[in-house]
């Protein structure tokens, strides 16, 4: 677009931008001698493109029409944009473009054309108030903008448009220099030409280079000096609009950097066209500005760095950068290291973004604390606690202060008793080097107390008594059993067993008189295994069938038995013995439910409902049992409802609740402590830990079954893997002669037959008299003395502890007390097993036996582990942990983690420390 400039203005502008003395002299000589070359009168291109059709449009458009459109052009010009050629003008001939193209290195052409230039300038000055057609004079579109954008903002008033532009200029990195010119000069000119020659070069001939892309927005010149006239205009404008500018400026956005007192030039600036256009469009919308508030602006962030555009990033700071990151809680069996925990809030400083938290990337804990371990090819187990060093780091943080805060009072009481009896001796970590460590000569040396010295003959005796039974590859744990039961039914079989006379008429034999599901039921197919079980179930329902005679009075009795399959699976039989409805002397009947779920109380309630219906009619049992079998399998702590019809009462709903703690579902410790003293109970448990043979004798089926289940429950987290028959029928008494380990209960009437059998190395316990009928005589020396003393103290003071704890919590029961006491006992023995789990290169977990055993500082514990680690219970326990792909979440693992948190760093102590220091000094002297 052609804009008129007076001769004085052109000379002033050209004089202010002369690069050297030679140009100034040439300019002065031109003024003094007169201009002969008209091309030299052409004004220099100061960043403003001229329309080649200006002359034609000035003749066609009337003055009135141009005045009416002056407002729109002014609004576009005041934005501070470089107005380029219209895209329509590029379609004209090449001659017209060359005719109006100006040289970038000269201000004037040949002197022969001076008259034409003067007339041309006068013509422009006469039409200085004229305005072009707004549609034609719009800035052309480029890579970043288009004419459509300018058409959308064309209708805005000039004041509002300029204020919006100034608002953006105040919030950008470098303030744009808007100039308010007189109405006669309604357009701004850039004081720099990108086609001008570099400094220090001679003005050469005119060159017409290819057009380069120009920025839409105009920035300050490199010198940073504003002409005097324009500074006055800016000052006047700022005085009139100071309030508006102060309200629009944002205090949060950074101020432009200055380098050596000068604002960085255009050549050193990064491109902001896209950001500025986006920001400018957002400023036009009042709704967007209200929603975004003070932080409204471009969605892109501005860089302040001159060297690297990714160096400093302005980002709105937060009090906690991790507050928007949902972090899932870690599993209970492993805790994160301190280096994985997010740092304090004070560590985050704006404007730099903090790095991505490491705990979002890593899913395992691997802290290696020795060079030997680093050289090994095996890695630590990732599903359980790894090293003591990691636990020290973890306790050093905030968790250390609340280590004992959330533990129940009962657990704290038990821990205090064990710590007082045991002393300061705890396990120490042995770094695994990839080889089995051989027994060292000084392993048994140390500062052990005299009470812990073990006679050699005793250790030899225990080793000889240890049975060498074949391990069962099908190891069953309570957790695995419960997983397998999720898809099972509540029970497998229900039978009613009665006594029938033998053909000889002298004695009675048990027979099944009612069965559900029946053999003829549709859809029921009896397996071969079930047929074998049906043959022996009547014998377990009446283990003393030959001693029964018809009677008119009989006290109801409940008991249970266990059937062990060849694969190690167990079936629980829940029985209730009673007299059938009738008059006179009658033979008793037994209701028996066979299930894979160990929950005595739940099935006792079902058997009570069966008894109620069978008294009315045996036909009512089938509908009820079918509704129970179709009921869903209850989860721990859940209740299921069974609906059935009862004549005279109508429809009934029976709620069956399964206890939350599945370990103690079929356990009654009251009966166990009623029959056995604490001293005898500890000796029985010690014999079972070494997998010896144990026989219980009692005159009641319920006593035998309850005591047998309770003793087995004390072995948690280990599971008895061998023969387990709480009630053994008299006809099967020969089983006690088996050389394999077993736990068997027999009635007192079968005791004479038992004494006649050749039995060796067996512990026979009379539950009614609380005494040992036969023993090996070393049962009280099996367990470590200090741990055994702590366990005995807790069990002997159980009533006092329960009385104290029940004042604070009603959930404390005898079962929970006994369970926590034995769990703590085993945590002291094997609670550090996870520290000796390694993972091979193939991803297989491997247990390191020798480092595990030697990690105990107590010699008595190490001697016990020598024997206990050879049992099938321990082997199955480790095998189950090795094969599991996910961590175990039982009570034992929870208490083991809490125990590992209290382990101090392993340091040499006592005589060992002195001997090691002397050894190092001797080696040092030998080197000299």
UniProtKB/Swiss-Prot annotation:
Keywords: Guanine-nucleotide releasing factor, Phosphoprotein. The modification Phosphoserine is found at residue 271. Residues 67-105, 245-266, 428-456 are annotated as: Disordered. PROSITE patterns: DENN. It holds the Pfam family dDENN. Residues 663-796 form the cDENN domain. Residues 492-641 form the uDENN domain. The keyword Transmembrane does not apply. GO terms for molecular function: guanyl-nucleotide exchange factor activity. Guanine nucleotide exchange factor (GEF) which may activate RAB9A and RAB9B. Promotes the exchange of GDP to GTP, converting inactive GDP-bound Rab proteins into their active GTP-bound form. This is DENN domain-containing protein 2C. The lineage of its organism: Eukaryota, Metazoa, Chordata, Craniata, Vertebrata. The gene is DENND2C.
